[in-house]
């Protein structure tokens, strides 16, 4: 990508984000109205923001109706990888988990699909990376879907971390009767997360924000890390897949969706939180979203392994982070506009 185009995209993204505060004030309290911009214009904006490096599965959110961004087929296990000085990736090409090492123990983020994956990929990864599973003090679950909590009961019963999830999603899981084949049961309810709540372990503090949309109580947060001693702040958006309807619970196949309108308000709020906090990178709980692990050839784990001294981390880049978040917002706007327009047939 030419330098001038990169500079234009960065400037464009910054200008759009600067307008978020105004949009939030105007839209959070306003009734749903038909978008004044045609939904296809939002799709085009997302494609522009994607440029050459954020194309692919993230843009599937902009298809009408939206397609699943998840890869199909048997999951491929990623090599356990030290991503930053204190952050480690443990997952597959479909779902992620992260270990955040502090001066007083480990904060584990998400737990994969089931006990077998948690034991083989998370605990096996700990041991391969020289981490001690007994130092897992907290297990943070980004939301109450089984591809994120499926291994939690095993970790809870075996290593006894405190398990944290938002109050709305704990309540949602309390109504769950049966586990899906291939996925583990919910953990025993332990600690509830409220909006703005802080978790401090040793020298690390995370502040959690309730960002309903993907589920009633999806949480998002900023992760402080260092790369070879240099500090960075990563944005972690906790629920990437878009709802299918405007209002909560209207799509039977995904009854936990809170609707596109609520999702949009949460996303706008968290973008502003990231901007105010100075986020300069991002990670996700699905690796095809942040391109942490795709195929072992053209992903960030591979690029990180091939870094030369002085090269920046592939997870860091303020412009890229902003464009990633704005693609999600544009696709959300496109889906709202498409539904409000009566779901017309669209050539993809």
Regions found by a protein language model. Name each.
Residues 63, 67, 82-83, 120, ...:
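Metallo-beta-lactamase
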Residues 21-28:
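Boundary at the C-terminal end of the N-terminal hydrophobic targeting segment
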Residues 32-37, 42, 48, 116-120, ...:
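Active-site HxH/HxHxD metal-binding segment of metal-dependent hydrolases
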Residues 73-129, 221-247:
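Conserved beta-strand hairpin/beta-sheet module of binuclear metal-dependent hydrolase folds
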Residues 1-5:
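N-terminal secretory signal peptides that target proteins for export/translocation
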Residues 28-73, 228-231, 242-348:
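Accessory terminal helices/loops
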């Amino acid at each position: 990508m030419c330098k001038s185009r990169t500079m234009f995209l960065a400037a464009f993204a910054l200008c759009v984000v600067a307008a978020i505060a105004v949009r939030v004030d105007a839209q959070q309290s306003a009734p749903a109205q038909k978008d004044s911009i045609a939904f296809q214009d939002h799709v085009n904006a997302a494609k522009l923001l994607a440029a050459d490096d954020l194309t692919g599965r993230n843009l599937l959110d902009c298809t009408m109706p939206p397609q699943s961004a998840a890869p199909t087929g048997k999951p491929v296990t990623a090599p356990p990888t030290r991503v930053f000085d204190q952050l480690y990736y443990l997952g597959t090409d479909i779902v992620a988990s992260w270990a955040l090492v502090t001066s007083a123990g480990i904060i584990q983020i998400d737990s994969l699909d089931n006990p077998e994956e948690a034991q083989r990929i998370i605990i096996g990864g700990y041991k391969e990376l020289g981490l001690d599973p007994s130092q897992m003090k907290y297990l943070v679950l980004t939301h109450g879907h089984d591809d994120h909590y499926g291994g939690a009961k095993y970790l809870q019963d075996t290593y006894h971390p405190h398990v944290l999830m938002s109050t709305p999603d704990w309540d949602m899981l309390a109504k769950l009767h049966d586990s899906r084949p291939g996925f583990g049961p919910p953990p025993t309810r332990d600690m509830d997360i409220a909006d703005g709540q802080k978790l401090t372990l040793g020298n690390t503090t995370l502040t959690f924000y309730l960002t309903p949309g993907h589920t009633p109580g999806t949480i998002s947060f900023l992760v402080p890390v260092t790369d070879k001693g240099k500090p960075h702040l990563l944005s972690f958006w906790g629920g990437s897949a878009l709802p299918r309807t405007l209002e909560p619970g209207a799509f039977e196949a995904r009854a936990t969706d809170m609707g596109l309108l609520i999702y949009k308000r949460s996303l706008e709020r968290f973008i502003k939180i990231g901007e105010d906090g100075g986020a300069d990178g991002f990670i996700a709980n699905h690796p095809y979203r942040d391109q942490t692990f795709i195929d072992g050839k053209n992903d960030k784990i591979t690029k990180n392994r091939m870094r030369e001294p002085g090269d920046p981390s592939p997870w860091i880049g303020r412009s890229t982070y902003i464009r990633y978040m704005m693609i999600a917002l544009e696709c959300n706007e496109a889906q709202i506009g498409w539904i409000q327009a009566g779901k017309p047939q669209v050539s993809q």
